[in-house]
Amino acid sequence: MKPKITIIIPCYNSEKWIEQCAMSCLNQTYESVEVIAVDNESSDGTVAILNDIKNNNPELIISSAKNIYPNCWDEAREEGFRLMTGDYVITIGSDDYIDLEYVDKCMSVILSSPKNIKAMQTPIQGIRQQGEEFVSTGIIQHSYKSKEQFKKLCLTKCPVNTPSVIYSSELYHRGLLETKPKEYGGAADYDLYCNLIDNDVFIYPFPQWLGFYYRWHPEQPTWNVHKESRM
């Protein structure tokens, strides 16, 4: 049997998107997938929608976490880590979605060299609403060939597509996926990547887009972080 992958979906006021996200994860063609949705104290219909989905998909695990830190998903992700039973784990935003073969394609790459690939990221396809339709905003990808090159990129930007990263669960059990939202807020992932590279964990940047859709919209935490940084 192939290694299990856990997909964690942190949710906060996601009633517009959560069904598309959750179903894209539940319907993956990869044979061993665990999906955990963690609500972060939503005040809209997110939880009701998740419960409706679970009625037809009992394998969906639903949990909750306190919403302590603004503009980040760390509390919900930590709850997902606590519950996960997968050999690998990915955290997908509740406003994003993936092609049905995304996990299968990613795991084929990882399992081609499991001792060397403990973490992997992929390019993401940006999408934005335009009227009644969603249009592409282009592919976002990062390229580096060594840990040293990665460290240099970290001096000027975050060279990681955060929601696309698949980690070996071994990293969590070694304490290497811990984040510090109290200190860094929405930039806690950036600190995580610097800590990983300092511990010789290379996030392999797969060069081809495999089916990840990243939704741009004014309500997302990324926009809020940018707004606050300009104040």
Language-model regions, residue ranges each:
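Short loop->beta transition adjacent to catalytic acidic/histidine clusters or analogous donor-positioning motifs
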Residues: K2-I5, L26-A37, G45, P58-I61
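Short, well-formed alpha-helical segments that are part of the catalytic scaffolds
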Residues: S14-N27
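Acidic helix N-cap motif at the loop->helix transition within catalytic regions
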Residues: E19, D44-I53, Y97, E101
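A conserved acidic beta->alpha catalytic loop
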Residues: D39-A48, N67-Y69, G93
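Glycine-rich, basic loop-to-helix element that forms the pyrophosphate-binding segment
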Residues: A65-M84
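Short aromatic/hydrophobic "clamp" motif used to bind/position activated sugar donors
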Residues: V89
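Conserved donor NDP-sugar-binding/catalytic core segment of glycosyltransferases
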Residues: E101-S136
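Conserved nucleotide-sugar donor-binding catalytic segment
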Residues: Y144-R230
